[in-house]
């Protein structure tokens, strides 16, 4: 990867005008912050966020992945085991906590094994924010910014260092998720095309809209460049799933991404060894299984990349 990025830089040096080989944002283009979220577990939220972060880094973008989920599955897949590698005050909580133990965000950012991809790992400590915030809200005398602005303010010092930030949000609508939503420029909602999952998503969206309205009235930012629904774990031969996807498209229109993420044993088997499809050896699967999964994943991530580029005015 280092050699590939060096080659991209060399080719761009000989190109006049707009950069062609290095896709990094210009000074006039704002940092893209994507919140990947859903209220219901099993929607492939973490799988989506992790593969998207790796894809963008492989494409040459400077990416920061932020694990906001106490389960810390994204951290584990990116080489940081929460039980052994992540200590106290080494998560995003360390940079947004309310007391005098708060640290600068640069102290919790780590490199991953992939050039261009950094991570703020997670572990159970991040849930402390959910317990601290009600106490602060009740204590009118305690100084500090409101909860919904803390992640955005923490990221501000490193905004110029990255092109894209990706939040893997917890599967709950708490204070941490709301803070991530206020820091975000875009929202990606993963949904499994089953009736119960879509019903759960509907309730989640209704609750989110109500809470964001309150946050907006209090001064929080809720303006987004784009909002998309990604169909995950999709089985093309499943009739009811196809009907549900059709229903979603009739309800949400073009906000539903054109490309679904296919259900594949290649993705789930790679997860057994805490790897992504971009890391696992093709020889470990039948060629058809691996190729179909990779083609689906690349199509999804390429479509999301186009949304990012559109927000920058490039498409």
Describe the role of every protein-language-model region.
Residues 1-315:
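P-loop NTP-binding core
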């Amino acid at each position: 990867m280092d050699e590939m990025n060096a080659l991209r830089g060399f080719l761009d040096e000989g190109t006049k005008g707009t950069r062609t080989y290095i896709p990094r944002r210009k000074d006039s283009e704002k940092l893209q912050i994507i919140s990947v979220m859903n209220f219901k577990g099993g929607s492939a939220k973490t799988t989506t966020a992790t593969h998207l972060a790796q894809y963008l880094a492989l494409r040459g973008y400077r990416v920061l992945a932020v694990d906001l989920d106490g389960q810390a599955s994204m951290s584990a897949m990116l080489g940081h085991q929460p039980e052994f590698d992540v200590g106290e005050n080494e998560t995003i909580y360390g940079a947004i906590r309310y007391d005098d133990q708060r640290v600068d965000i640069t102290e919790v950012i780590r490199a991953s094994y992939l050039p261009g991809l950094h991570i703020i790992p997670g572990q159970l400590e991040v849930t402390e924010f959910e317990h601290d915030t009600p106490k602060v809200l009740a204590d009118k005398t305690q100084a500090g910014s409101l909860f919904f602005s803390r992640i955005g303010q923490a990221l501000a010092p490193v905004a110029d260092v990255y092109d894209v930030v990706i939040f893997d949000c917890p599967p709950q609508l708490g204070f941490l998720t709301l803070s991530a939503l206020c820091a975000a420029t875009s929202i990606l909602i993963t949904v499994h095309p089953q009736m119960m999952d879509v019903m759960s998503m509907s309730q989640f969206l209704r609750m989110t809209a109500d809470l964001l309205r309150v946050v907006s009235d209090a001064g929080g930012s809720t303006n987004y460049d784009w909002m998309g629904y990604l169909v995950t774990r999709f089985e093309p031969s499943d009739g009811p799933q196809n009907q549900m996807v059709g229903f979603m498209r009739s309800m949400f229109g073009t906000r539903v991404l054109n490309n679904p993420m296919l259900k594949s044993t290649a993705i789930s088997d790679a997860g057994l060894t805490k790897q992504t499809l971009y890391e696992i050896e093709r020889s470990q699967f039948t060629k058809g299984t691996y190729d179909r999964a990779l083609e689906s994943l690349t199509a999804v991530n390429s479509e999301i990349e186009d949304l990012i580029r559109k927000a920058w005015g490039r498409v």
